[in-house]
Structure formats: C-alpha cells, structure tokens
C-alpha cells in the first residue's frame, strides 16, 4: 500500500503545527514561571488551549483512518507498538484535561498548586516528546525504511 502525497503532506503539517505550538507553549510557560502574573497566566492558557486542540486533532488523524491504520495494514506485526501509542494518546488526554482544569483557576496566588502544576506540565511535555519520538521512529521504519528497502 503506497503512502499518498496527501497523507505525507498532512503528516508533515500536523507535526510541524504541533512543534510550533509546543515551542510557543514552552516559551509562555517559561515566561509564566519567571513572573507569575495574571497576564502571563492568560497568555499561557491561550496557547495551552491551542496546543491541546491541535493535539486532539492530531491524535484523531492518527487513530481514525489516519496513518496508524496504514501502519497496521502494511505491517501488522507492529500492532503492539500502535496499541501502545494509542494508549498513550488516552493517557496524555487525561493529563491535558486535568491541567486544563487547573489552569481554569488562577495559579498565581497559590504557590504550592503552581509548583505542582509546573512539575506536571514538565512531565507532560517530556512524555509527549518521548511519544512523538516513538511515533516518528515507527513511521520511518514502516513507510520509509521497510517500504523503501524490503518491499
């Protein structure tokens, strides 16, 4: 099964969009950590919501008729890896929902809650980075390395 140019373009666009939003989110997070003001909190929340929405669309693209199905169609033996990545999607969504609830309140006045949020946010970004790396490695292996060499 060939990977269409449309699918490749969409994969590239999805990942580029997430990368740009993640960089902006990390910048806003750093600014908020430097100065816990209501203005910086609002700025961070706005970008967090954009990142969360984009990530949700990205996960849906992968899961529902997106390229993870093509991974399985092409290489069914990768089912365990795909299942793990999809399980991580659910787990990341749970953390995003929890952090969004935290952000709905002003964290600037509650130092212990703010510190807990910071730790949880850093953990999320680390986990997301590892998830994306595992996903890229799988996609490269299936669509480009295996497809270009062993088909």
Language model region names:
Residues 1-151:
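Small-residue-biased structural context
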């Amino acid at each position: 099964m060939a990977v269409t140019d449309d699918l490749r373009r969409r994969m590239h666009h999805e990942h580029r969009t997430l990368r740009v939003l993640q960089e902006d989110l990390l910048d806003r997070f750093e600014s908020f950590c430097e100065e816990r003001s209501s203005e910086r909190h609002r700025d961070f929340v706005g970008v967090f919501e954009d990142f969360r929405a984009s990530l949700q669309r990205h996960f849906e693209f992968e899961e529902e008729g997106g390229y993870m199905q093509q991974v399985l169609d092409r290489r069914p033996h990768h089912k365990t890896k795909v299942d793990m990545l999809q399980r991580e999607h659910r787990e990341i969504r749970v953390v995003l929902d929890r952090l969004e609830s935290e952000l709905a309140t002003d964290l600037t006045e509650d130092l212990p809650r703010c510190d807990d949020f910071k730790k949880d946010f850093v953990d999320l970004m680390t986990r997301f980075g590892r998830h994306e790396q595992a996903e890229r490695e799988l996609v490269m292996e299936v669509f480009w390395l295996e497809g270009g060499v062993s088909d």
